[in-house]
Each structure stands twice: as C-alpha cells, then as structure tokens.
Amino acid sequence: MTTASFESYGELDGLGRCTTAFANIGKDLMPAEKRGSIGEVKPTGWQTAKYDNVDGKYLYNRCHLIGYQLTGENANAKNLITGTRYLNVDGMLPFENMVADYIKETGNHVLYRVTPVFSGDNLVASGVHMEAESVEDNGDGILFNVYCFNAQPGIAIDYATGDSHQDDSIVADASKSTTAADANVQTYILNTNTKKFHKESCNSAK
C-alpha cells in the first residue's frame, strides 16, 4: 500500500454502465467547496420516479460510487450510478462518513474501492460492493468489506430498465446487510444521537 493519494475511475462498459472506482484518499483529495450540479448526468436505468413513501419523494438519486465528500468529484459519469434513496443514505453514506471522519481526525490515507454489481444486462445495479482499509495503520482505523443493496422499502424495481411501482410488501431486511457499525465494531462505535462514528476511547461514544 502507498501513502500517495490517487483516484481512478473505470471506463463505462458496453452498455454505458459504471465499472469500478478506486482511490487512495487523503486530505488533499477532499473538496474545499460545495458540490456542484450533477443533474446533466443520466446514469443507466435513470428514471424520475416519485413516491409518497420515499424520504424526499424521489426514488432514485445520482449515487456517487466514491462520495463527493471524499474525492470532490462532481458530474463524473464514471462515478455516478442510478441508486435508490435508501442505498444512498442508509446504505453507503454511513461508510463514507466513517472514512471522512477518520481521514480528517488522523490525516491518514484510506485505500477505497467501490464496485457496482449488475446482473446480466440490467441497467440498474443490484447493489454496490464497498471495500476500504486505512493505510498508515494497516487497517486498524478503517477496515471493511461490505455489500449494500440497491433497494427501497415499499417499492418494487425492475433492474433491467429502472421501472418501478409501489409494493408495500417489500421490506428492507437489515439482517441481510452488513451495517457500518458491524463492519468495524472493534474500532468505532455509532453514536445514535449524532449519527457519527467514534473510537471506543472517545467520550462521545459513551
């Protein structure tokens, strides 16, 4: 592993789908300004669908493989997939926040890779595979290897096209997903009030 920062985004495949985003994230890659517009990017399977039972109404987000807070990528089509609100906020964001907090607190680097998983020729990913390891301390601070489902409670999704409809029988099964708290429980504890991860020795974790 190296302590030199870098970022790399795989070429889109023959169907225009994202492949893999890979980076060694340090403070120097993290953005100093607010995120710009990404609305011009239409990832594969993109649909504008609104439901009253979805937080924020919109089913789909333009979901960064590597979050903006980590590498400052805006409208990079190689880094944006069609992801549900649930994937973006409840699935990926806690892990992204964990990494961002660690880098800001330590100044260390985190080797980070996110790969969308598509079934066959589907245009919408079934989920994303997230991997991370802190470099300078050989994974003592950050170490996870998780899969986050691209699903939405109460909504049925046709992953081949991105079409969707309301189906209240669909419930997210947390037992099938690895949570951020589970991924590094020996090093970080989730403060349920602030939604932030803290080291076990930190007063904020108690």
Predicted regions: what they are:
Residues T2-K176:
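Domain-level detector of nuclease and nuclease-like folds
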